[in-house]
Amino acid sequence: MGLTTPFFGDFFRKLYVARFAEIVSVLIKGGIPIAQAIEISGHTLGSALYREMLHEVAESVRRGELMSQSFSRYGKFFPPLVTQMITVGEQTGKVDEMFLKVAGFYSREVENVVGNLVELIQPVLMVVIGVLVGLLFAAILLPIYNLIQVIR
């Protein structure tokens, strides 16, 4: 599933942002420099696209560019909320806390999507199981019915 497919793309973007933000928050709290934390997080996400984007963001941060400006260039993959929270973190000096809040928000978004998907799948599975039971019932009873017809 690609990041550009209508439903799954949005889901995976939220998932990657949540994982990225949580990893960066933990690394920054652990004393890792911000640019290095961004780059490390890119290697842990499992997406070549995000790895490349985060490498470019880390390089621009190393050159002295603000993180919020670097992330705003990738608005399709990092929503405005992310850049706004990073801006607040840069202004207050609490970047790690802002990343943790972003991670919490997007983790809840992912949980909501998964919960809604499960709620949609359950009725469909019940119908499929009902059809399969009906087919099994017919497969068992039709030969018996045909046998009775032949005997008469």
Report the location of each language-model feature.
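Membrane-cytosol interface motif
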Residues: M1-Y16
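Bilayer-spanning, highly hydrophobic alpha-helical transmembrane segments
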Residues: R108-R152
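Glycine- and small-hydrophobic-enriched helix-loop-helix hairpins
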Residues: R13-L120
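Short capping/connector residues at structural and topological boundaries
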Residues: D10-F12, L100, L147-V150
